[in-house]
Amino acid sequence: MSESKRIKTALVSVYHKEGLDEIITKLHEEGVEFLSTGGTRQFIESLGYPCKAVEDLTTYPSILGGRVKTLHPKIFGGILCRRGLEQDMQQIEKYEIPEIDLVIVDLYPFEATVASGASEADIIEKIDIGGISLIRAAAKNYNDVIIVASQAQYKPLLDMFCLLYTSPS
């Protein structure tokens, strides 16, 4: 991500919410807007911060029992849009796609579900499609988007924000 660009919009969609509150608070303090899915959106709102539902942006509901939530051009276009390419910028303007500058996502606990002896049906539902797609899209556009793909990356992100956005006294 370019040094001078501030994060305006963060897509947050996580299974594990522990430790997320500190990140959300810091992002909110810096004026970052949140875009999220069901449970994560409710978590962010429970902290007292506004959060736009993915469904409001896409104008499409979560379908197939929650299997399809973020797989939409208005989400992936906002992540994959190359900010320095005029053609990309014209297209996102034409289709009213917001730039997404930060993606915070983690994957369903597939291995833990398998190890728990869960049923095949439960195991299959823990195969994450949207989460891994978001990670790959953000990684592909690493020049313009920051990706946080696990709880282990929350502290480094928080440290980065403290360095970038805290004025020396």
Language-model segments: what does each one mean?
Residues 39-109:
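Glycine-rich nucleotide/cofactor/substrate-binding loop typically near the N-terminus or early
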Residues 8-11, 32-33, 52, 76-79, ...:
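Structural motif
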Residues 105-125, 129, 133-164:
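A short, charged helix-loop
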Residues 3-7, 70-76, 110-119, 139:
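Gly-rich Lys/Arg/Thr-decorated short loops/hinges at beta-loop-alpha junctions or inter-strand turns
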Residues 165-169:
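Conserved small/polar residues in nucleotide/adenosyl-binding loops
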Residues 5, 18-22, 35, 39, ...:
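Conserved active-site and cofactor/substrate-binding residues in soluble primary-metabolism enzymes
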Residues 22-23, 45-49, 56, 63-66, ...:
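Short acidic, glycine/serine/threonine-rich loops at helix termini
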Residues 2-36, 40-52:
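N-terminal glycine-/serine-/threonine-rich phosphate-binding loop
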